[in-house]
Amino acid sequence: MDAWVRFSAQSQARERLCRAAQYACSLLGHALQKHGASPELQKQIRQLEGHLSLGRKLLRLGNSADALESAKRAVHLSDVVLRFCITVSHLNRALYFACDNVLWAGKSGLAPRVDQEKWAQRSFRYYLFSLIMNLSRDAYEIRLLMEQESSACSRRLKGSGGVSGGIEPGGPGGPGIPGGGLPQVALKLRLRVLLLARVLRGHPPLLLDVVRNACDLFIPLDKLGLWRCGPGIVGLCGLVSSILSILTLICPWLRLKP
């Protein structure tokens, strides 16, 4: 089992490096096309991107089983919302990897009759559902942390009789701001933004997870035709997300838990 864990970790690191290189090629290809580079060079970059994509699919063989194991562990979480979001996310990831394995079989020639377009659309749908669950989980954790921070700030204000740390009352769980009108609404919004910034600054793993999932969201949206972003945006978002994923491998404390 230890040997499998080490092998899986190595495969995961290689897959993320390949992913970063793939989206870097996508971004580079878009830049070359925009600046009128030679067709031969553009073709070579596209071929390299395709080879990296196929290599990633090979490295992801068996990831469905890992995702199912993660879903089984998430079922035992005590928080109902986290249990639902994380379990559904892992189940969709398992289905995404299963579709990806079928695609690999088709692209590698093992199953030449596979309808690659149909399976690609299926895989991106499952990928999109997984990301939606991840972002829902992030939003839930942010809300909980904002409520905790607001309550702590209110307690400090009652003890000191003044404004502490630049965050005034009025956040979730706070005493609120009397009155109405546009100035009060703008002030409440400003306080919420400051509170959000403080929460994210104090929880780097959550901040990285939000940015990574938000960047990844553009990929299935573009591939499914729900929001055409273009290869440049997809390449940039994929590259940023890949770098953040590699960072969580290098610094495990930056990985959001559970």
UniProtKB/Swiss-Prot annotation:
Gene Ontology annotations for the cellular component aspect, listed alphabetically: peroxisomal membrane
Transmembrane segments: 232-254
Modification sites for N6-acetyllysine: K43
Segment forming the signal sequence: none
Keyword Membrane among record annotations: yes
Keywords assigned: Acetylation, Membrane, Peroxisome, Peroxisome biogenesis, Transmembrane, Transmembrane helix
Topology versus the membrane: Single-pass membrane protein
Cellular compartments annotated: Peroxisome membrane
GO biological process terms held by the UniProt record: peroxisome fission
Pfam families linked to this entry: PEX11
Family: Belongs to the peroxin-11 family.
UniProt subunit comment: Homodimer. Heterodimer with PEX11G. Interacts with PEX19. Interacts with FIS1.
Function as written in the Swiss-Prot or TrEMBL entry: Involved in peroxisomal proliferation. May regulate peroxisome division by recruiting the dynamin-related GTPase DNM1L to the peroxisomal membrane. Promotes membrane protrusion and elongation on the peroxisomal surface.
Designated name of the protein: Peroxisomal membrane protein 11B
Organism expressing this protein natively: Bos taurus
Lineage: Eukaryota, Metazoa, Chordata, Craniata, Vertebrata
Gene behind the chain: PEX11B
